[in-house]
């Protein structure tokens, strides 16, 4: 295991989430959740993070998609934060503007330790591939809070819900990759810590 890799298990009465994440090694990505579209988006996220990841999520109660989406976001957020360690030398900031056919999405991140998010997506459909689109926004907010990453995801154009969501995950993945690269000798903050 590299020094910037993490294994996490979170188990509640509602879900069980297992994750291995290596943010420094581009390798195999395996994702298994009970929600097919979530599998697609998480695979996209990890791929564009240039990471190695294995995520298995079990929904014990099968009420709807909310619990598995939320708990998965918690685990990924906590794992990313843990993998970063003391954050010494990381680039810290990144932004992307991602086109996908009709869609154009801006993603900006600051690995500041302050998990505040602003998500502005106009998702026309209520559901896609077994996933309530309101839970896409909830995923991003929950990841931001638990990772300590300040995030803005803003839809600039687009009408196809799938394209808007996928562009958002691509942009987030690549922004997290760039912002987490070690490029400085010291912590990139006037305060001296993040």
UniProtKB/Swiss-Prot annotation:
Record's catalysed reaction(s): D-erythro-1-(imidazol-4-yl)glycerol 3-phosphate = 3-(imidazol-4-yl)-2-oxopropyl phosphate + H2O
Pathway noted in the entry: Amino-acid biosynthesis; L-histidine biosynthesis; L-histidine from 5-phospho-alpha-D-ribose 1-diphosphate: step 6/9
Enzyme kind, highest EC tier: lyase
Cellular component GO terms held in the UniProt record: cytoplasm
Molecular function per GO: imidazoleglycerol-phosphate dehydratase activity
GO biological process terms held by the UniProt record: L-histidine biosynthetic process
InterPro entries: IGPD_sf, ImidazoleglycerolP_deHydtase, ImidazoleglycerP_deHydtase_CS, Ribosomal_Su5_D2-typ_SF
UniProt EC number: 4.2.1.19
Entry keyword Transmembrane: no
Keywords linked to the UniProt accession: Amino-acid biosynthesis, Cytoplasm, Histidine biosynthesis, Lyase
Name assigned to this protein: Imidazoleglycerol-phosphate dehydratase
Species: Sulfurisphaera tokodaii (strain DSM 16993 / JCM 10545 / NBRC 100140 / 7)
Source taxonomy: Archaea, Thermoproteota, Thermoprotei, Sulfolobales, Sulfolobaceae
